[in-house]
């Protein structure tokens, strides 16, 4: 969607995901009120784009290591958003004062700015998070009083690079088992469902 081959070839990744959702709904017995988005790196940015563009479809987002690169859509309706990001990320920098990818759009903001942008989009109360839950290896900053009963959260991993997961993948080391990021994401997502119109 945003970078590398898909971006260069202008592939319709959002259309593909929506088609997959439509086929799964048509062919399987699923709870349509609990269709969630998640992804890592470009997949996180795509998850946030889908939330922005098609908020009527998805119940919540919890993704890892990237930001929303688009402007808010006028027809966006608030849904819960969580982004999980390693403080030591050298690919998509936490602060994004600079970036190692040739994508100028990604230099607009970092993890904190992404949190604040979603808080504004979700009509959250206050200019700063009203919840801060620090622990030894990570912290969770959240806006909890938002439109549609939503929340917006940023999980900051103190000792993680671009890969926030426990296990290493390819050339990206994991967090060494210090933080169960999958568990954090699922605990967030599973709290939310969406009212489905008949």
Which role does the model predict for each range below?
Residues 89-92, 162-164:
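Acidic catalytic loop of the alpha/beta-hydrolase fold
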Residues 25-27, 32-79, 90:
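Primarily recognizes the serine-hydrolase "nucleophile elbow" in alpha/beta-hydrolase
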Residues 7-15, 41, 52, 105-109, ...:
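Soluble non-cytosolic domains of exported or imported proteins
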Residues 83-85, 89:
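Short beta-strand/loop motif that positions the catalytic acidic residue
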Residues 18, 48-52, 186:
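Short, hydrophobic alpha-helix immediately C-terminal to the catalytic nucleophile
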Residues 1-42:
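Gly/Ser-rich "nucleophile elbow"/oxyanion-hole loop immediately N-terminal to the catalytic nucleophile
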Residues 79, 116-198:
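Alpha/beta-hydrolase-fold serine-hydrolase catalytic core, especially in secreted/extracellular enzymes
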Residues 1-9, 102-103, 166-177:
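Acidic/histidine-rich helix-loop elements
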């Amino acid at each position: 969607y945003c970078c590398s081959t898909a971006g260069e070839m202008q592939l319709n990744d959002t259309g593909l995901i929506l088609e997959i959702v439509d086929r799964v709904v048509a062919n399987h017995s699923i709870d349509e009120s609990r269709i969630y988005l998640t992804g890592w790196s470009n997949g996180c940015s795509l998850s946030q784009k889908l939330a922005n563009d098609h908020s009527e479809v998805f119940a919540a987002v919890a993704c890892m290591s990237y930001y929303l690169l688009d402007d808010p859509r006028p027809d966006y309706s608030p849904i819960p958003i969580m982004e999980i990001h390693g403080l030591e990320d050298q690919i998509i920098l936490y602060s994004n004062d600079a970036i190692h990818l040739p994508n100028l759009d990604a230099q607009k903001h970092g993890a904190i700015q992404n949190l604040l942008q979603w808080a504004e989009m979700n009509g959250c109360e206050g200019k700063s998070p009203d919840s801060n839950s620090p622990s030894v290896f990570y912290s969770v900053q959240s806006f909890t009083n938002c439109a549609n009963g939503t929340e917006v959260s940023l999980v900051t991993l103190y000792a993680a690079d671009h890969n926030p997961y426990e296990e290493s993948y390819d050339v990206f080391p994991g967090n060494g088992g210090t933080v169960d990021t999958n568990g954090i994401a699922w605990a967030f997502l599973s709290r939310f469902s969406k009212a489905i119109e008949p």
